[in-house]
Amino acid sequence: MSAEESEEGATPAEVIEVVGKTGMHGEAMQVKCRIQEGGNQGRIITRNVLGPVRVGDVIQLKETAREADSIGGQ
């Protein structure tokens, strides 16, 4: 499988803030990212991301409509 095939249908989003760690063992990072293409272009959403991530990284989102719940909300 080539890189082009795996990114088919994905939307790029730039990480603008790392909110914190989430998950039972802190394995995921919650980030705020700005959608760069498509109908939601310019919208800022909160997502959970696995693996190392920092501000300025561009991640590929399969779905831009879903948002993650806030960390430690009551």
Swiss-Prot record:
Keywords, alphabetical: Ribonucleoprotein, Ribosomal protein
Protein's UniProt keywords contain Ribonucleoprotein: yes
Record-level GO cellular component terms: cytosolic small ribosomal subunit
InterPro entries to which the protein is assigned, alphabetical: NA-bd_OB-fold, Ribosomal_eS28
Ribosomal protein found in the keyword field: yes
Gene3D superfamilies, per the entry: Nucleic acid-binding proteins
CDD domains xrefs: S1_S28E (cd04457)
GO molecular function: structural constituent of ribosome
Coiled coil spans: none
Record GO biological process: maturation of SSU-rRNA; ribosomal small subunit assembly; translation
Classification via Pfam families: Ribosomal_S28e (PF01200)
Homology family: Belongs to the eukaryotic ribosomal protein eS28 family.
Protein name: Small ribosomal subunit protein eS28
Organism: Halobacterium salinarum (strain ATCC 700922 / JCM 11081 / NRC-1) (Halobacterium halobium)
Primary gene name: rps28e
